[in-house]
Each structure stands twice: as C-alpha cells, then as structure tokens.
Amino acid sequence: MREWINQSKIDLLAKEIGEENVPILVNIFLGELNDYQSKLVSDTVADKLGYLKEISHALKSSAASFGADRLCAKAVELDSRAKSGEMMDISLEVEHMLELLKQTHQCYSDLVH
C-alpha cells in the first residue's frame, strides 16, 4: 500500500485540516475515482480521449493533494501529451488509467475503512 499512498501528503493534509476531517475528504476523493472509472467504461462517453484529457487535468490536482503519486504522475503525463498533440493509443491509455484508478481506490478505501 505504501507504494500507492504518499503518507507524508496525508500527514500534511491532516495537519492542515485536522485529522478528523481526513476520512471525509478521502471519501470525496474515492467518489471522484468511482465516477471516473464508471464514465471511462460507459458507452455514453463517446469521446474517450476527450474524457481522458478532462480527468487527467482534474487528477493532476486532486491526486497530488492526497498523495496518490502514481495516479498523479500518469495524469501529468497524459495532460502533457494531450497538450502537445501527441498521438496516443486510446484503448491502452484508458485501460492503464482504469487500472490506476482501481488500485488507488482500493488503497485509499483501505486507509479510511
């Protein structure tokens, strides 16, 4: 689990907002991760690349705030590649993002439950 959670970020967050508030915010983060996973696999999202860009931009901030360093690194990478116009294998990137979202969700869920 340590490889998925940057504990120093969680400790800093606890210091800033109070330890008792960390589970509340982590649960909000977990909901965000669930939403992203659901929409990435949904047939209602026709533009997977556009949605991947959208969530990558959002995850740069939220994943960094919660110390989800692996997820943050992937979000930064995808956001940068999208902005540079680099071609991507969309199905591969969606699959990789889904795996990162799933693993991150599991680790943070274990942290607060």
Curated annotation (Swiss-Prot):
One of its GO terms (biological process) is phosphorelay signal transduction system. Pfam families: Hpt. Keywords: Phosphoprotein, Two-component regulatory system. The keyword Phosphoprotein applies. It comes from Vibrio cholerae serotype O1 (strain ATCC 39315 / El Tor Inaba N16961). InterPro entries: HPT_dom_sf (IPR036641), QS_phosphorelay_intermediate (IPR053403), Sig_transdc_His_kin_Hpt_dom (IPR008207). It comes from the Bacteria. PROSITE patterns: HPT. Signal peptide: none annotated. Residues 18-113 form the HPt domain. GO terms for molecular function: protein kinase activity. Monomer. This is Phosphorelay protein LuxU. Phosphorelay protein which receives sensory signals from a sensory kinase and transmit them to LuxO. At low cell density, a phosphoryl group is transferred from the sensory kinase, probably on His-57 and this phosphoryl group is further transferred to LuxO. The modification Phosphohistidine is found at H57.
